[in-house]
């Protein structure tokens, strides 16, 4: 007889399912203000404790506490609030438009607004972002025209991308927003390469890339970490741990019993684990990582702990795999509500101002939608010309493509 039990595999399970309340104790939260802030020139190995703790600034009463408090000005706080509100309202309006069959597809960032907006405010003009489909807040924070965003969603005759990208896969070189890819984890290797190119040219611009918790299981994630470490690429690598990769719990990607931030430390990269629903913590950690990159101190990996409050996309029904009230029970709360409480406590915001701003931004989004629809909708056939498929690739069109264009008569 064998002295050993039969071998068996471990399959991680979520701590909550429909009809069974989620136990969020697996998150291992740190009290606000208690996590140390190292100097920007810290050795990566000395950030190992920061990869397991949780950087937080806002306490339960809305006070900013601890060494990570970025001491933002009133103007910065107001800009951040407006950017988060506009992002959420834009999402809500586009979700409604999809349900009305005005759009074919949409993806929200509900509950994750602070990650894109605060991070963007901590960057500089010229820094290049390599986003996923939940970082529309970058464009909104950088005041990219809402009309152009909606025209892209509609793929109409005014679509800046001429109908060549799926809805929500925006792109704008001028806004420092690299083309979104539907393939997972491509953002990391692209950003590392861009950052290396910036260094080779002797530039001062840095790169910042985003992926989700599920995409850390892709090989590109590990390849990017290797190159970033070896060449000390000026890049920020953001892992948005929103607990779910479509219907797959984050533990399946390797988050059980450890953190995604810890993978950076193992690769020789300075790493942080941060409350992604704390606007001030997001700004502070982003500013710290950006300073490291800009001072040639190497890359940083940041795990943003948050919660995907909405469905994965308009094709998803999360009620099939998680409790309906999960977001309301998530211990890190709503990023907008938390910043609002802080600003009211400072005396620079009020419920009345919040409501008035909400209405004004809602009207702005609606006006942008109407203007975008004037350039064409899904049903009226006003789309980019067929001739546009021959543009924007070759400086001089090859003979075989000239023949094809002639045959099409465009």
UniProtKB/Swiss-Prot annotation:
It comes from the Bacteria. The keyword Oxidoreductase applies. Gene3D superfamilies: 3.40.50.970. GO terms for biological process: branched-chain amino acid catabolic process. InterPro entries: Alpha-ketoacid_DH_E1_comp, DH_E1, Oxoisoval_DH_suAlpha_N_dom, THDP-binding. Its cofactor is thiamine diphosphate. It holds the Pfam family E1_dh. GO terms for molecular function: 3-methyl-2-oxobutanoate dehydrogenase (2-methylpropanoyl-transferring) activity. Its EC number is 1.2.4.4. SUPFAM superfamilies: Thiamin diphosphate-binding fold (THDP-binding). It catalyses: N(6)-[(R)-lipoyl]-L-lysyl-[protein] + 3-methyl-2-oxobutanoate + H(+) = N(6)-[(R)-S(8)-2-methylpropanoyldihydrolipoyl]-L-lysyl-[protein] + CO2. Keywords: Oxidoreductase, Thiamine pyrophosphate. CDD domains: TPP_E1_PDC_ADC_BCADC (cd02000). The keyword Iron does not apply. Belongs to the BCKDHA family. Heterodimer of an alpha and a beta chain. The branched-chain alpha-keto dehydrogenase complex catalyzes the overall conversion of alpha-keto acids to acyl-CoA and CO(2). It contains multiple copies of three enzymatic components: branched-chain alpha-keto acid decarboxylase (E1), lipoamide acyltransferase (E2) and lipoamide dehydrogenase (E3). PANTHER family: 2-OXOISOVALERATE DEHYDROGENASE SUBUNIT ALPHA, MITOCHONDRIAL. This is 2-oxoisovalerate dehydrogenase subunit alpha. The gene is bkdA1.
């Amino acid at each position: 007889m064998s002295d050993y039990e039969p071998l068996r595999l471990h399959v991680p399970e979520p701590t909550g399912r429909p009809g069974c309340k989620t136990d969020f104790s697996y998150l291992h939260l740190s009290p606000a203000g208690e996590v140390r802030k190292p100097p920007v020139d810290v050795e990566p190995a000395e950030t190992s404790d920061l990869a397991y703790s949780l950087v937080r600034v806002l306490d339960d009463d809305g006070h900013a506490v601890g060494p990570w408090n970025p001491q933002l000005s009133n103007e910065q706080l107001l800009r951040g609030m407006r950017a988060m509100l506009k992002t959420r309202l834009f999402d809500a309006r586009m979700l409604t438009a999809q349900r009305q069959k005005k759009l074919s597809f949409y993806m929200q960032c509900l509950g994750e607004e602070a990650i894109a907006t605060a991070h963007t405010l901590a960057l500089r003009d010229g820094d290049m972002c390599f986003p996923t489909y939940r970082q529309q807040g970058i464009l909104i924070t950088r005041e990219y025209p809402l009309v152009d965003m909606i025209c892209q969603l509609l793929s109409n005759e005014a679509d800046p991308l001429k109908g060549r990208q799926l809805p929500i896969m925006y792109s704008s070189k001028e806004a420092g927003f690299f083309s979104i890819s539907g393939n997972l984890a491509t953002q990391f290797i692209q950003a590392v390469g861009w950052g290396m190119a910036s260094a080779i040219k002797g530039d001062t611009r840095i790169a910042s890339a985003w992926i989700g918790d599920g995409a850390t299981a892709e090989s590109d994630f590990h390849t990017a970490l290797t190159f970033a470490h070896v060449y000390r690429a000026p890049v920020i690598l953001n892992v948005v741990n929103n607990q779910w990769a479509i219907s797959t719990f984050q533990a399946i990607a390797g988050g059980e019993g450890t953190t995604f931030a810890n993978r950076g430390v193992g690769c020789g990269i300075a790493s942080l684990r941060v409350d992604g629903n704390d606007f001030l913590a997001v700004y502070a950690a982003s500013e710290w990582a950006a300073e490291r990159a800009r001072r040639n101190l190497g890359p940083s990996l940041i795990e943003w702990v948050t919660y995907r409050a909405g469905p994965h996309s308009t094709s998803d029904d999360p009620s099939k795999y998680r409790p309906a009230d999960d977001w309301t029970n998530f211990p890190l709360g709503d990023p907008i509500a938390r910043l609002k409480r802080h600003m009211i406590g400072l005396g620079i915001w009020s419920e009345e101002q919040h409501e008035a701003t909400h209405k004004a931004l809602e009207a702005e989004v609606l006006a942008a939608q109407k203007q975008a629809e004037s350039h064409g909708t899904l049903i009226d056939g006003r789309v980019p010309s067929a001739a546009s498929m021959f543009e924007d690739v070759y400086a001089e069109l090859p003979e075989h493509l000239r023949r094809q264009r002639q045959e099409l008569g465009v």
